UniProtKB/Swiss-Prot annotation:
Function: One of the primary rRNA binding proteins, it binds directly to 16S rRNA central domain where it helps coordinate assembly of the platform of the 30S subunit.
Keywords in alphabetical order: Ribonucleoprotein, Ribosomal protein, RNA-binding, rRNA-binding
PROSITE patterns found in the cross-reference section: RIBOSOMAL_S8 (PS00053)
Subunit architecture: Part of the 30S ribosomal subunit.
Coiled-coil portions: none
Taxonomic lineage from the root: Archaea, Methanobacteriati, Methanobacteriota, Stenosarchaea group, Methanomicrobia
UniProt cross-references to HAMAP family, sorted A to Z: Ribosomal_uS8_A
GO MF entries: rRNA binding; structural constituent of ribosome
NCBIfam families recorded: PRK04034.1
The UniProt record lists the keyword Cell inner membrane: no
GO terms classed as biological process: translation
GO cellular component, one term: ribosome
InterPro entries: Ribosomal_uS8 (IPR000630), Ribosomal_uS8_CS (IPR047863), Ribosomal_uS8_sf (IPR035987)
Protein name according to UniProt: Small ribosomal subunit protein uS8
């Protein structure tokens, strides 16, 4: 059975493992986009370390959880967002001002909504975490 949305599967696996109190979570299949999203979550402190495991099929990420994820999810469809529209999406998906992150795919790579605002660019919404 093929997977339709690997980012949504990974985000729900992270949330479910965090809710159960597990110390780590295995995400498969791996991709560069998912790795970039995990790097952003790690830099913000929502997850601990993670490493890529090459199993000869699709690859896996082993993510060590820190217990700081309240909720995370993928945003589908991937809405195109301009710089002036970021505040609307921030109020729609995040519970409060300066709380949580929107993750965007931009022309300069995968960034948070704060980094995109500082760079003055928009992009496509991938997910959120708080």
């Amino acid at each position: 059975m093929s997977r339709q949305n690997t980012i949504a599967d990974a985000m729900s696996a992270l949330k479910n493992a965090g809710d159960c109190g597990k110390p780590e979570c295995i995400l498969e299949p791996s991709s560069k986009l998912l790795g970039a999203m995990l790097r952003i979550m790690q830099d913000a402190g929502y997850i601990g370390s993670f490493d890529m495991i090459d199993d000869g099929r699709g690859g896996q990420f082993r993510v060590h959880l820190s217990g700081r994820i309240n909720k995370c999810g993928a945003i589908t469809p991937r809405y195109s967002v301009g710089l002036d529209e970021l505040e609307y999406w921030e109020t729609r998906y995040l519970p409060g001002k300066n709380f949580g992150l929107l993750i965007l795919s931009t022309s300069r790579g995968v960034l948070t909504h704060n980094q995109a605002r500082q760079n003055g660019i928009g992009g496509e919404l991938l997910g959120f975490v708080y």
